[in-house]
Amino acid sequence: MTKPASAPFLDFGEAGKKTTGKILLVEDVESIQLAIRDFLFARYDVQSVTTAEHALMSLAMTPDIDLLITDIKLPEMNGFELGRLARKLRPNIPIIIITSYDVNEFIDIIKEHGFSQIITKHGRMSLKEIEITVEKMLSGDIFGVQKYFPQLRETEITLADFPRTFANAVLYTTRVRTLHERGELTDRIAAQFKSQKKAPESTTKLVLDEITSNAMFRAPVNDGGEFKYQTKNSHHDILQTHQNIVLDEEDRFTLQFGVCDEWIIMVCIDPHGRLTKKEILYRLHRHLTPDPNTGLPAGLHDSHGRGIFLLREQLSSLVFNIDRGRKTEVICFYNTTSAQAYKNISVYEIDNV
């Protein structure tokens, strides 16, 4: 049996500081409702109800509600149905879904209605995740791993001065310019995580490979919309990577990594913002939904997209921050001492396109 992962998040902001924002919380379990309300009360105006009917009445009668937090399991209807009806009243209201159940069971409705913030309940860690999610959704300030680990100190490095040991609470940052650099960094980082934190090298290398592959091969395109560093095979539905790649200046991406207590942190930031919330939910759905004819994942033979599913399965937490057409940040957390049974879905998207 796995024990729940301990919280990576420390309190941030000034104690007692009130942030503009009114939140409607829908939770029928009194102890959970009180815990969430008390946790958010110092910064937000929180109105709490226990039923979907009361929630819809509040939304109709209180036009200044800025955000809805709802449990999935409610007396009259589930939280997804409440979210759908809430959007009819308030089309642009941000919605956070919370649950004690396996999010994967609801992947059909998640994809259909574009729910992108689903947090599983697992103690204090989920409370901090809710607080950070609320802050990001209301402020629009979505980028930065320091929102989750405020104690991180950032330091820039290159391959030439790659650290022999990763200092605790230091976020190492480097720019990736070539295919060779990507490979060297992936190997060195994964090996150091194994040596220092006993993290499975196969897992961290898979994560690093996946997040940097998207930044290097799929994000950069030319004026015609074709991939700059991959070529489609004319005989098969596969993409072939160019050899000895040197990225153009505008395509170079940032890789960040480090350790903080029992946590391993990996972040990749590209300057293109081509990944979308719709694509992420679609790919998760493809790999979580069985083909009725084979019983295997529907996306098993897709030419791409499996990496998003693999990342979420391997990591303790996975966060996508997207400013469409400008920037994508993929944040990966891996706990080296404990596991989290059910995984969140966390996709933030600013659409400037």
PLM region descriptions:
Residues 18-19, 135-213, 217-245, 258, ...:
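Bergerat-fold GHKL ATPase/HATPase_c domain
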Residues 241-247, 251-254, 258-302:
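Glycine-rich/acidic phosphate-handling loop/turn and adjacent ATP-lid/helix
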Residues 81, 101-132:
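Alpha4 helix (beta4-alpha4-beta5 surface) of REC/receiver domains from two-component response regulators
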Residues 48-67:
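Acidic, metal-coordinating helix/loop segments flanking the phosphotransfer/catalytic sites
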Residues 75:
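The feature encodes the CheY-like receiver
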Residues 19-31, 35-40, 68:
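Conserved acidic segment of CheY-like receiver
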